[in-house]
């Protein structure tokens, strides 16, 4: 999992143009991953969607959404050229990752992370496969809207195990896009760090 995070972060950094403010960033404090088995859909196009309502505390704080094809092993990561798009629906931003399921993939990992400070809500995760040209099928996902009755609010997800006294995760019963609940992530007191480092030999 750690290698996956490094790969995704490097990929994100490599595709971003730096402004002066982007020489600073927040270290990643929290993430969760939805795994989707895909052996039955190899070679087909897919769409993955997640709704986010973000109230960042500053311009550097943000949500990051990524995805990757994964082979048989847990660290068997396959180069994945997915496209990320977004649209607004009321007070929510719906992020869509689209691409093709690799012929050697056993699963897709979809990764959501919070960098920085603020309140962030996640809800209404969905996954679609193009079974024939123009014919999309929605594939059921467990706990897609954080409505599970399990005491584990991350039932059906991988989640960062890093302990933090600056980040709180909980289910919100007051802010949600569909159903009656969403995942709320509240982060505070984090400090940005510089991308520029100086080393001496």
Indicate residue ranges for each PLM-predicted region.
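Bacterial Sec-dependent N-terminal signal peptides
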Residues: 1-22
């Amino acid at each position: 999992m750690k290698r996956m995070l490094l790969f995704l972060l490097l990929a994100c950094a490599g595709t971003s143009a730096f402004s002066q403010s982007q020489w600073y960033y927040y270290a990643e404090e929290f993430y969760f991953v939805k795994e989707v088995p895909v052996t039955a859909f190899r070679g087909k196009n897919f769409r993955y969607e997640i709704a986010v309502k973000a109230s960042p505390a500053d311009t550097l704080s943000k949500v990051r959404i990524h995805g990757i094809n994964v082979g048989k092993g847990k660290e068997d990561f396959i180069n994945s050229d997915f496209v990320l798009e977004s649209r607004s629906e009321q007070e929510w931003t719906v992020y869509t990752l689209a691409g093709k399921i690799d012929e050697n993939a056993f699963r897709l990992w979809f990764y959501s992370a919070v960098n920085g400070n603020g309140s962030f809500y996640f809800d209404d995760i969905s996954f679609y496969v193009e079974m024939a040209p123009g014919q999309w099928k929605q594939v059921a996902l467990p706990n897609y809207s954080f409505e599970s009755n399990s005491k584990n609010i991350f039932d059906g997800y991988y989640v960062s195990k890093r302990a933090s006294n600056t980040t709180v995760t909980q289910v919100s019963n007051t802010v949600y896009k569909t159903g009656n609940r969403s995942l709320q992530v509240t982060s505070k007191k984090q400090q940005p760090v510089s991308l520029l480092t100086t080393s001496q030999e």
